[in-house]
């Protein structure tokens, strides 16, 4: 007895998807995203109004990959229709930080009184807005938005001071 392992993802209005060979493309009001999906024994089909991810057998690793592919496809579809956003707070008590966006980098100046600015990478087509003590990281690719926010948070990690006293830094406060 072979169990059917299939996941279906609904395609919302205003989003069009296509699959050519192993490259999945999603187009929506926010933009276009492409991603390659390939794993032995797993098929992805685009039907009317839905995407179906199915496995040839019911092995444990194929079942896991079906769930992984379904989650990635769902995130691509949500990204082009709604987008992803991550809010961060700039916290300082001892030395006021100057934060600004320069091209594909975020420059953090005067962190803990340091003379040399710290630089965090902005990945892909992610947009970063700085207003007062708040940073908003937004984009259509969930992985790029999350990694950009993590890059910013990591650049302000305190290593040579007591973190109970020096709580300066940039912290993620909300993911949406």
Swiss-Prot record:
Keywords: Ribonucleoprotein, Ribosomal protein, RNA-binding, rRNA-binding
Purpose: This protein binds to the 23S rRNA, and is important in its secondary structure. It is located near the subunit interface in the base of the L7/L12 stalk, and near the tRNA binding site of the peptidyltransferase center.
Pfam family, one: Ribosomal_L6
Molecular function terms from GO: rRNA binding; structural constituent of ribosome
The protein's assembly and partners: Part of the 50S ribosomal subunit.
Organism: Methanosarcina mazei (strain ATCC BAA-159 / DSM 3647 / Goe1 / Go1 / JCM 11833 / OCM 88) (Methanosarcina frisia)
GO cellular-component term (any): cytosolic large ribosomal subunit
Family to which the UniProt record says this protein belongs: Belongs to the universal ribosomal protein uL6 family.
Biological process according to GO: cytoplasmic translation
PANTHER family referenced in this protein's UniProt entry, alphabetically: 60S RIBOSOMAL PROTEIN L9, 60S/50S RIBOSOMAL PROTEIN L6/L9
Designated gene of the protein: rpl6
Organism phylogeny: Archaea, Methanobacteriati, Methanobacteriota, Stenosarchaea group, Methanomicrobia
Name of the molecule in the record: Large ribosomal subunit protein uL6
PROSITE patterns hit by this protein: RIBOSOMAL_L6_2
């Amino acid at each position: 007895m072979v169990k059917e392992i299939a996941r279906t993802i609904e395609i919302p209005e205003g989003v069009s998807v296509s699959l050519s060979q192993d490259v999945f493309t999603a187009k929506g009001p926010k933009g276009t995203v492409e991603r390659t999906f390939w794993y032995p024994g797993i098929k992805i089909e685009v039907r009317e109004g839905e995407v179906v991810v199915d496995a040839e057998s019911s092995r444990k690793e194929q079942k896991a990959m079906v769930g992984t592919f379904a989650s990635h496809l769902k995130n691509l579809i949500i990204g082009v229709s709604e987008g992803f956003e991550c809010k961060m707070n700039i916290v300082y008590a001892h030395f006021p930080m100057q934060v600004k966006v320069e091209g594909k980098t975020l420059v953090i100046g005067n962190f803990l009184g340091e003379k040399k600015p710290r630089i965090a990478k902005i990945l892909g087509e992610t947009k970063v807005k700085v207003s007062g003590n708040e940073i908003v990281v937004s984009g259509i690719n969930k992985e790029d938005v999350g990694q950009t926010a993590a890059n910013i948070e990591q650049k302000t990690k305190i290593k040579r001071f007591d973190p109970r006293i020096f709580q300066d830094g940039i912290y993620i406060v909300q993911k949406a």
